[in-house]
Amino acid sequence: MPTRVFSQEPDLVAALPRLLQHARRFFAADLNVLGSSPPDRASPQEGYVGLRWESARYPGQGTFRVTSRAANDDDRFAAEAAEARGRAGGMSELAARCACVWTITTEGEATGTAELQLSALLASVALGPVLPEDGSTLYGVRGAMERAEKAAQS
């Protein structure tokens, strides 16, 4: 399963201005929007954005598709299991408060820690935890950036 970011923000497309602002202000990154669902779609919870990420802080760049959908029981069970595996106390409760899940898919090649950094950016706007594709734990913005920093130093 791809990396999931639990989101309290109900509309990924409407969150684009904040994502762009946070990328520059807090992540020293260039984020370019390559495409998105129309803003006036029938279900705001369902949508996508195509993004190009390039970081100045830690090595990493890539093109990604982020899709949004309603969170379901499988997502919540996966969050509970990851919390137990990773000893991430309280993070599954935060995930349970999130009505949406944003899924990150790499399109083409991503280098360095681009996906980790993008997941941190998304979590900063979504106000929910990140569930990495290996399901090993749950973490927030700080946890994602700590992993990116550690990977950049190795």
What are these regions (language model features)?
Residues 1-154:
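Acidic (Asp/Glu-rich) sequence patches and key acidic residues
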